[in-house]
Amino acid sequence: MNGYIKTDKVFLFFAIFAVTFILFVLRRPDLITNPQFWAEDGRYWYHQAYTLGPLHSIILPQNGYYQSISKITASLSLALPLWCAPIFFNVIAISIRCFVVMFLLSSRMSSYKLLP
């Protein structure tokens, strides 16, 4: 019985993730159909990962801040062709938004009244 409960939770996790991902893409389909670097994505983070190397670019602060997620994304996107890098950035950004929705719907937030 415990195996079924765990399997159901995993299925629910992926189902909620897929639905929220699709909803975010339907809201702005150009994120997938016409991907492009946005703001610092290409000018700083991808450029630093490409020229300085993935590890050095991650520990290099940008304007006094460590932009960890963005720089790790840039470092991972080096494994892809250049034309795939912007869509990779967009998929990671949409996924992070999906995880926020999933967190708000999780049992950890059950003590808070999110909806009236």
What are these regions (language model features)?
Residues V10-F11, I59-N63, S110-P116:
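Membrane-interfacial loop-to-transmembrane alpha-helix junctions, especially the N-terminal start
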Residues L23-G42:
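Helix-to-loop transition at the C-terminal end of transmembrane segments
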